[in-house]
Amino acid sequence: MSEMDAVNKIRELRDAFGSFMTGVTVVTTCKDDGTPLGFTANSFASVSLDPALLLVSIAKTSSNYHNFADASHFAINILAEEQKDVSNIFARPSDDRFAQLVWAKSEYQNPLIDGVSAWFDCTTYQVVDAGDHAILIGKVENFTSAGFAGLGYYRGAYFTPAKSSTDVISSMKVMMMALIGHENKILLEQTADHKWALPHLMVEKDGAEKALEKIFATYQPEASPSFIYSVYDDVTTQQQYIAFLCNTPVPTAHKGQFVDLNDLEKLTFTDSALQSMLMRYRKENYLKTYGVYYGNHTSGTVRQIVKEGV
């Protein structure tokens, strides 16, 4: 293989790796003198639940390589969908990146960035040599998940899962529903005929994203969308239903009430499709494995898309 062929092969391999959609993280630590350091990475993965381990890789050509490979601690900050600017700060050269951020030092002396979807405060468990990179394996000492939708990365460009998902919604009559979860509870409201429903709103000309914003403003302003959970048609009403899986860090609501998932059998719902969807959600929430339902009011298929790690 010629040198040019080898270069082209590496480029093709990089492009192939780029076909895998990932989130965006900022990996942080502090030098012995307290100076904060960080770099962006999408090569993040959970490794183990017991003990709680995760990994991220760093290129040996990185100016931060020795600082992180020799560090006894580091943190993973998973960026939220509104934090493209934070990712760009760490992607560009700067004398003091952290001066542009709101952050705090953790118990283990790692910078934790404000407003992230989640953070993991780690001690270094192992550093593994891996070709032109090193794999940093961290032992999770503490973590927080805010429930915000994460910032995505695909083929060299950012995307936001919730906003991208709204693009698939057609111009037909659409009912938007928000499946807003908090821990082992789901937000429901009781209708005038004493049946239960999800927070919902008909999509108008201003689009699905605005409909979601209105639902959140009415029911739970701290909620944020993750991805489409169910898409189905009802031929009797000639209407399409879109349900977004959402999360909130707040256990109370402006309207409706949070109901324990174990109490679903005690309730009467507005229709059988909603009841079936909530029963599926209860099972998937327990397993921490989520899928998307495509079909009609009575039958369809579920495709797994998310399996939570650490």
Swiss-Prot record:
E.C. number: 1.5.1.36
Reaction equations catalysed: a reduced flavin + NAD(+) = an oxidized flavin + NADH + 2 H(+); FADH2 + NAD(+) = FAD + NADH + 2 H(+); FMNH2 + NAD(+) = FMN + NADH + 2 H(+)
SMART domains: Flavin_Reduct (SM00903)
Keywords, in A-Z order: Allosteric enzyme, FAD, Flavoprotein, FMN, NAD, Oxidoreductase
Reported regulation of activity: Maximal reductase activity is achieved only upon trigonelline (TG) binding to the reductase component before interaction with NADH. It seems that TgnA undergoes an allosteric transition upon trigonelline (TG) binding accounting for the positive cooperativity toward NADH oxidation.
Bilayer-spanning residue ranges: none
Chain positions recorded as FMN binding sites: T40, A41, N42, S43, S57, I58, A59, K60, T61, S62, S63, F90, A91, R97
GO molecular function: flavin reductase (NADH) activity; FMN binding; FMN reductase (NADH) activity; riboflavin reductase (NADPH) activity
Top enzyme class: oxidoreductase
Biological role stated in the UniProt entry: Involved in the degradation of the pyridine ring of trigonelline (TG; N-methylnicotinate) into succinate and methylamine as carbon and nitrogen sources, respectively. TgnA catalyzes the reduction of flavin (FMN or FAD) by NADH and supplies the reduced flavin to the oxygenase component TgnB.
Quaternary structure and interacting proteins, as annotated: Homodimer. The trigonelline monooxygenase is composed of a reductase component TgnA and an oxygenase component TgnB.
Family statement drawn from the similarity comment of this UniProt entry: Belongs to the non-flavoprotein flavin reductase family.
Name under which the protein is recorded: Flavin-dependent trigonelline monooxygenase, reductase component
